[in-house]
Amino acid sequence: MNNKKTSFLILATVMLLSSCGVVANQKAPISQNVANQTTEASKSQPFSYQDYAEVLSTYVNENGEVNYAQLKENRAALDRFNQSLGRVTRATYESWTESEQIAFWVNAYNSFTLQAIIDKYPVKSIKNIPGVWKFLKFEILGESMTLDGIEHKVLRKEFNEPRIHMALVCAAVSCPYLRQEPYEGDKLEAQLEENTIQFLSLDSNFKINPEDNKVELSAIFKWFKEDWVATYGTEEKFTKFNSKEGSVLNFITNYVEGEELTKLEGAQKISYFDYDWSLNKQ
């Protein structure tokens, strides 16, 4: 096992041991679940993810793959959860911590994506659904928003947290894994770190070719590289790259060590893997 894989495995193990698992809740009647979620929101407390947790633990496997066929046949919990997102008031949302707000939006993006897929399933790729990102709208915080609106106008614009790109799942094979639990404010830091470690541990997302000093990265780092500048921008390292690319590489230095770190810091060029848009289905 190479140093990169060993380092990622150790880090991932630490994160897993330090994080709390999701405990499955007994299924309640539809009206009771909706009432519980609405009441929770009206008290200006963190939103209830009970129904969403049930969906993730039941239909998502350890590789982040979704059993869309079964979810489509048993979609009541997902529909309840997505409907409850529209009933959260702006005042309630603004009473939450930043971590709770980020968790809310990431969960919403991922759950709405699940809805978009099962509404049209069977499909081979999310890209086969016309307007899925730009025109298809969902109710959240009392208004209609698109998936692009959630990602680009809220998460990327209002928060300085580039690791959201390790959490947003657009139902494709090359996306980050969909977790088997919801994101939650008090666990968000650990969850995002675990996601990043897992994502970078895959050679299909991050690989160093020492023969020509080239770093190969997921296309996610190409599409959203500017999101790393605010926190990871550097003028001292990676001077052969533009500021955006250097920021991404500087970010990745936090997740490699030893020989791998030396190779990364000596990189001369970057290339990006083709993105596999095939459906992330079981």
Which residues does each PLM region occupy?
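Residue-level signal for mature regions of secreted extracellular proteins and peptides
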Residues: 13-14
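Interaction/scaffold regions that mediate signaling and macromolecular assembly across diverse proteins
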Residues: 22-95, 99-106, 110-282
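C-terminal motif of bacterial Sec signal peptides marking the signal peptidase cleavage site
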Residues: 17-19
